[in-house]
Amino acid sequence: MEDIQSHKDYRNIDIDQVGVKGIRYPITVLDKDLGEQQTVAKINMYVNLPRYGEQQTVAKINMYVNLPRYYKGTHMSRFVEILNEHSHRVSLQNFSEILEEMKLRLNAQSAHMEITFPYFINKTAPVSGSQGLMEYKCTFRGSLNERTDLVVAIQVPVSTLCPCSKEISDFGAHNQRGEVRVQLRFKKFVWIEDIIKLVEASASSDVYSVLKREDEKYVTERAYNNPMFVEDIVRDIAMKLNKDRNITWFSVEAENFESIHNHNAYAYIEKHKNS
């Protein structure tokens, strides 16, 4: 059959990224406590991950390659074929391998893949010991030109209490949920759980899925005794990441969903570290 995609295109324009977007696909990711975790990710293809315990999940995946000006189109089916050949074992360890295969099979100079998935941790309430699953949105994003560039991104819900409100009020202080988004480049493998714990320790308090009354008392009092601006959160996290020699680049952003204002509070730090 005639291969239309390989026909010559006369507009003489390169395409930076072309491929498949929004594939929902079951994957297995490493779980530090349980072993592997199976999850569902939304995948955009580019590549790399390791092994321990495992958790199954569903990912949303995007996979792209560049398209030179002299080709009319790319072969979309090959992206999914490459994904299927890895039999759900998409991870940081084989991310680079998948990117290399994309470049080879699609005759491309560059490849890019994004895998976004919910990651679950069974979290224990601080006093009662009640347990409940917490969901964290994670993304593995990688590109391959001459070499592989891999970024891990994690979103962590937190609770914050306003230092100014506490200082000026006779009773209580305004508090709210917030979200911290961390992106990392690194030399060796990083655990999702370790980054989540680092972030949660830098907020006024953790967020939990299950709390009994004694837990609520503990959480609200802890937040009151540990007030934080968004500026405090990003600075504290940046200090910790800056001390980690495994991290080569990071960005940290904190956003508070303000409870008494008609806007959110926001802060951002980015740092390229010397290798």
Question: Residue spans of the language-model regions?
Answer:
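N-terminal intrinsically disordered, cationic/polar leader segments
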Residues: 1-275
